[in-house]
Amino acid sequence: MNNVTPLHHLYVHIPFCHRICPYCSFHKHTPGGTDITAFVDALLKEVEKQPLKPKTIFFGGGTPTMLSDTHLERLLRGLKERLDLGELVEFTVEANPRTVTPSKAAVMRGMGVTRVSLGIQAWDDATLKTLGRDHSPAEAEETWQVLRDAKFPSLNLDLMFSIPGQELETWRQNLEHSLSLKPDHISAYNLNYEEDTDFFRRLQKGEFRTDESRDTDFFHLAIDLLEANGFEHYEISNYANAGHRSLHNEAYWLGADYLGIGPGAFSTIKGRRWKNVPDTDRYIALTLSGGSTVTDVEELTIEHRRTERFGLELRTKRGLPLDLIALDQRRMLDTLRDQGLLDYNETFVWLTRTGKSLVDPIAVALMGEA
């Protein structure tokens, strides 16, 4: 064990939500019937299975702040007791409006959480209703103020755009209101229609429609407005003030190994990827009895890993290493640069403002796939 290199990135999946949003495909459910104490114990037992010396920890979900103050403190304290946190530089917890009280914020801050990502999604009632969110704009602002008062070093707002019925001017107002709150980071996601969601079924029925031109207009408005206000557009969906990039997500985008614990969580370690069983009660029973929660093990081929690097690293401001592009495909670089879609130097290839809205087809073109 002493010869094993410890992992530096830990993801903890907490699947509980007040209600199930119609666009979300992550493993999640309401907490009714789940033994939350046993769930926390299972997480703490699982985290001991791999050597860890985390530089980043990320609590995602679901809604991690659905845990009570007592359970959240038990989990955070348990991690501190079990892990060497001497190199920890970022500890993020996702939260939703109405789930953070001053006492819960104090628990998180006191236990070493450095960053909170608040899932606002929108600031207007009509869009929130379409998204099936269970908070009002006023409740979102109240939660934001609680987090500000707790003096977390870094706060993020999560927003979504290109939502059915959403107008471009409404999106502008959402962005401007977000800026007025002075967040350290903003994530702005184009709505995706994921399989096994209510939104996907409505898309299939023709109730919703996609429009790439509309998506681009919303995307470019976000870029222009956020950059004009000093934010660095460092990844397709992410904007940060200086010193406030998401280090955990950056590690993922750049291909670092990571351990995921909790039901439905993915891990990628030394070319192997697996998922935990996406059933919370079964996850608890297996973990506490000493059984294996691992399912869907996948050995990542060199080509698979190369494809992922194109898809992820091209999304970043730094761009894709030039040496990943086959020599016979590099003629495409000048063609795409002449079209105003990318630029490059002797080390990296990166997308322009126009190219960022076409990241997927550009990645395919550079990989040389049909």
Language-model features, listed with the residues they occupy:
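Conserved N-terminal Rossmann-fold NAD(P)-binding element of oxidoreductases
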Residues: 12
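Local cysteine-cluster metal-coordination motifs and their immediate loop/turn environment
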Residues: 15-28
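A short, conserved structural fragment
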Residues: 338-347
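Minor-groove-contacting beta-hairpin "wing" of winged helix-turn-helix DNA-binding domains
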Residues: 348-352
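Short, amphipathic alpha-helical interaction segments positioned at domain boundaries
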Residues: 354-370
